[in-house]
Regions:
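Short glycine-/aliphatic-rich beta-strand segments at the starts of folded cytosolic domains
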Residues: 1-18
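Flexible glycine-/small-residue-rich
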Residues: 8-10, 40-42, 49, 166, ...
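Short amphipathic alpha-helix segments
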Residues: 15-34
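Hydrophobic side chains in well-ordered alpha-helices
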Residues: 26, 57-61, 246
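A short linear hydrophobic-aromatic micro-motif
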Residues: 35-38, 293-294
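Interdomain "pre-motor" coupling segment immediately N-terminal to P-loop NTPase/helicase cores
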Residues: 39-99
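Conserved helicase motor core of SF1/SF2 NTP-dependent helicases
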Residues: 104, 108-235, 239-318
Length: 318
């Protein structure tokens, strides 16, 4: 039995541990992807050679893994799975060409980076455009990264507030038929945004900002008649905004205003799907300076790798 060896003597013990993963989870993912055996012995990565092993791709994957460790000081089995999938599609060069710049820092000091090529393109688009549309299925990170971008803009004092909004339609439910005041009605629908805010700012800070209206949460209908200045405005679940609502929202933009519109066009709850303002906007607003339209793919799903396979199977029958 022969082995392919990669010298890691220039790497620290901690870096090699990160490469191996918690309880060797990264090595196990490499074993699964390459149908081989990866192990670490005497500061060397050893790979069992077999007839199907593509040694060049193994080298590329190991190099890409350490590239993430060098910049982000972390690596998990989901990263490894994604890197391997890119290698098999001959797209690793695209991944390495994208300088994965941190988007924001969490309350614990951890840096948030884009994890896929699509996410890196989205982050770059948010930095360089006034209006960004991000479409993609659940789990592609579009909403999370939009919030991270908004928080970073607020922390760096480039804007004065964050506005979070979304349509009030959800699987046939109407705010008018739900109990409680407006905040109680809207809050459950914005839970993913709250979770992201809490991770990046901490619960106490989020509550303080909401109280002072530094962070504003409101249904889309409440944007009518306003001019939004010095703010990052996130419209989530935008696939359920009508064409008229989308036009109304986009024309609220004032000075120093950035808008990020996120949605999943496979999850339209409107009676007529053709009434989706997100679908119309992505069609008619393409190729306008200052507006970027990003379509995230199933390969950008960053949840459990099984989620991507589930999404692909459902897509075949829908």
């Amino acid at each position: 039995m022969s082995f392919l060896e990669f010298d890691c003597s220039d790497r620290t013990f901690e870096e090699i541990q990160i490469f191996a993963g918690f309880q060797d989870s990264n090595l196990e993912m490499l074993n699964k992807c390459f149908k081989s055996v990866f192990m670490i012995r005497d500061q060397k990565i050893k790979v069992e050679v077999n007839d199907s092993l593509d040694t060049k791709k193994v080298e590329e994957v190991i190099d890409a893994c350490f590239s993430i460790i060098d910049t982000q000081h972390r690596l998990n089995y989901q990263d490894v799975n994604y890197i391997c999938s890119l290698a098999f599609k001959n797209r690793l060069k695209d991944f390495k060409a994208r300088q994965l710049q941190a988007v924001c820092k969490t309350k614990t000091g951890e840096m948030i980076y884009p994890k896929t090529i699509g996410q890196a393109i989205l982050c770059d688009a948010m930095r360089h455009n006034e209006v960004v549309f991000a479409t993609g299925v659940a789990g592609t990170g579009k909403t999370y990264l939009a919030v991270a971008y908004a928080v970073n803009m607020l922390k760096s004092e480039r804007v004065e507030k964050i506005i979070l909004t979304r349509p009030a339609v959800e699987a046939g439910e109407s705010l008018g038929f739900l109990p409680g005041d407006m905040k109680e009605k809207v809050d459950p629908y914005l839970r993913p945004l709250y979770d992201a805010l809490n991770e990046m700012l901490g619960l106490e800070t989020v509550e303080k900002y909401v109280e002072k209206q530094v962070i504003e949460i409101a249904p889309l209908a409440f944007m009518r008649g306003r001019t939004l200045n010095d703010a990052v405005v996130i419209l989530d679940e935008a696939q359920n905004a009508t064409c008229a609502q989308m036009k109304m929202f986009l024309t609220r933009m004032g000075k120093n205003c950035k808008m990020v519109v996120t949605g999943d066009v496979t999850q339209i709850d409107l009676i007529k799907k053709k009434d989706s303002g997100l679908m119309q906007a992505c069609t008619i607003l393409d190729h306008i300076d200052g507006i970027s339209i990003i379509h995230l793919e199933n390969s950008d799903v960053v949840r459990n790798p099984l989620v991507q396979k589930i999404i692909e199977r459902y897509a075949k029958v829908e």
